[in-house]
Amino acid sequence: MTTLTKIMRKPITSAIVAILFGFFVATIVLASAGYDPVEAFGALIDGMIGKPKYIANVIIKATPLLFTGVAVAFAFRVGLFNIGAEGQYVFGTVFATIVGVLLDLPPVLQIPVVLLVGMLAGAAAGALVGWLKAKFGIHEVITSIMLNWISLYFNNFVVNSEAFHKANSTKSLPINPSGYTMLFTDMKSSSDGLAALKDIPVVGDAIARTDANVGIIVAIIAAIFIGWLLMRTKVGYEMRAVGFNRDAAQFTGINVKRNLVLCMAISGALCGVAGALNITGLNPHSISVLAAFENYGFNGLSVAFIAGCSPVGCIPASLLFAGLLYGGQSVQQVVGAPSEIISIIIGTIVFFMALGGVIPMLAEYLDRRRAKQAKLAEGTVGADATTNDSAQGKEAK
């Protein structure tokens, strides 16, 4: 096996190739439409990392995507397709808002309670899907899609209910300030505090002008924990065994049904806490009437596939995805190209990630071909040696 084929077999190679193909296809589309691809990609990169404020907004946008991406990746490793991440996220936002409005505890209690309730709401929605799968064999895609719509209409019901509706708006009441997880909330509420924040080198202006919060820290910890849980614990081993082959896992004594329910509960909990953190960490700290989904859960599917369903790999994948979404606005503003070009890039990346097995297959083909050529070369050398020996024998006679 050569160095090239070793590199080709690594999962990260498939991801890099998919990303390159995504930008290659976008280049062709932009050039065909009469736009300068270099200028467009320059605007995209500048919109992602051109200012500290842009970087902060990319991180903020990546936070829920990291949670939902890890949730989908985790379920996929156990052989389940959690397309209900969107609904579990919405349930998390709704119940976090309900508790955040009704309770006004000290921050040291309010924040954990609000996040815990959001997490439990998502976990309950996920566990229900897992239980229906384990008990009755109902496919998780069907039940989770139905729960997505239930979550949307439940969200609208809560917003429009008398207890939570904000007058003359399509929003709910905001949660109490004791539940906020934004950084330096008190300083942002005064002009002197804002001035002091902006004096902080490098990050001060970004913190002052964005909803920077603790969410990304929690999300990274969650991604690392889920990766550790899957690869380093008995529970994770059993879940992966269920994902590889349920019949074989059942035969070895693993409780398949319990693991299916537990997996979906954990996956839903990740989505629920993502929703809760968006309520506690982002203005206006409330939920709104939804005419359509916000796509945090559905975009999490793309993040998971770009990461090759690796929980830790979802960290850079979510940042890339969020950067494309946020920086894509600059492409439209600076170059005038439609923002749909970003969707083309993302779609192409996901498409080629789905074909990620092709590159390892190509590496295997190259190894077989090289081995065959080496064998033929050895055979040729052996035949030449035999011919030479025969010729020498005849000369001796």
Question: Where would I find each of the regions flagged by the language model?
Answer:
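Cytosolic-side transmembrane-helix boundaries in multi-pass membrane proteins
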Residues: 1-21, 27-31, 244, 251, ...
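Short loop segments and helix-boundary regions at transmembrane helix junctions
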Residues: 2-13, 76-84, 106-108, 112, ...
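Hydrophobic core segments of alpha-helical transmembrane domains in multi-pass membrane transport
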Residues: 15-31, 68-72, 93, 97-99, ...
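Transmembrane helix-bundle core of multi-pass membrane transporters
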Residues: 148-230, 341
